[in-house]
């Protein structure tokens, strides 16, 4: 938009700022950009891989809401939030020797850690103490397989080590909302302690919940499924 501005001599000139002037209920100070967001679900709550595929397609259709730099294969970030895939988690955890309780009695933390092995081991030790301090159970830790060949050099150089942390209820009588709050507290305490100490600047929970899991990264929408 081009808007008129008064000059010192009372003359008018045209100036470009991209937004219309404040008028009526409109105020340009409240303008802001947002990421592209899509939502799809089965109204009967039925889970399926088909829903995930459709969500990935939505993500790809929103590629114009993302951005890339000089490397066309390094994006500014993309991801997907899904309902807890209990059957899948149970299957992959069995291969890792991790025994999961029934759905809702455990949470999954999608955790970013330092690429340095010693640093992330110390970070996980501190996280374990925090979980114990909140009287919950660490059930196990799973390495998340990634296919980093599909991403750009800049994204690969900045990529954290990714694991899934499985946390069980310390008290089986704990209701779903209370357990969700416990997981939230664990995540915030861990991020505050570990990042504030300067031990691991990579330490970050993309999600920590008994209900949902987030897969995301410095990706383009087309890379999420492959990565």
How should each PLM-predicted stretch be described?
Residues 1-13:
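Short, Lys/Arg-enriched N-terminal segments with co-localized hydrophobic residues
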């Amino acid at each position: 938009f081009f808007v008129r501005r008064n000059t010192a001599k009372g003359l008018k000139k045209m100036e470009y700022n991209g937004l219309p002037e404040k008028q009526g209920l409109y105020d340009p100070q409240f303008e802001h950009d947002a990421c592209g967001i899509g939502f799809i679900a089965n109204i009967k709550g039925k889970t399926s891989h088909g829903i995930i595929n459709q969500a990935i397609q939505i993500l790809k259709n929103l590629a114009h809401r993302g951005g890339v730099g000089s490397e066309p294969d390094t994006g500014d970030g993309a991801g997907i939030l899904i309902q807890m895939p209990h059957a899948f988690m149970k299957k992959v955890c069995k291969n890792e020797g991790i025994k999961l309780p029934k759905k809702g009695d455990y949470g999954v933390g999608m955790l970013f850690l330092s690429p340095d092995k010693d640093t992330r081991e110390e970070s996980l030790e501190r996280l374990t103490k925090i979980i114990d301090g909140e009287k919950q159970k660490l059930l196990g830790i799973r390495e998340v397989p990634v296919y980093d060949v599909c991403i750009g050099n800049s994204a690969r150089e900045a990529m954290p080590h990714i694991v899934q942390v499985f946390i069980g209820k310390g008290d089986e009588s704990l209701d779903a909302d209370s357990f969700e709050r416990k997981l939230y507290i664990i995540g915030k305490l861990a991020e505050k302690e570990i990042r504030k100490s300067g031990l691991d600047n990579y330490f970050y929970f993309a999600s920590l919940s008994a209900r949902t899991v987030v897969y995301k990264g410095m990706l383009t929408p087309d890379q999420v499924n492959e990565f």
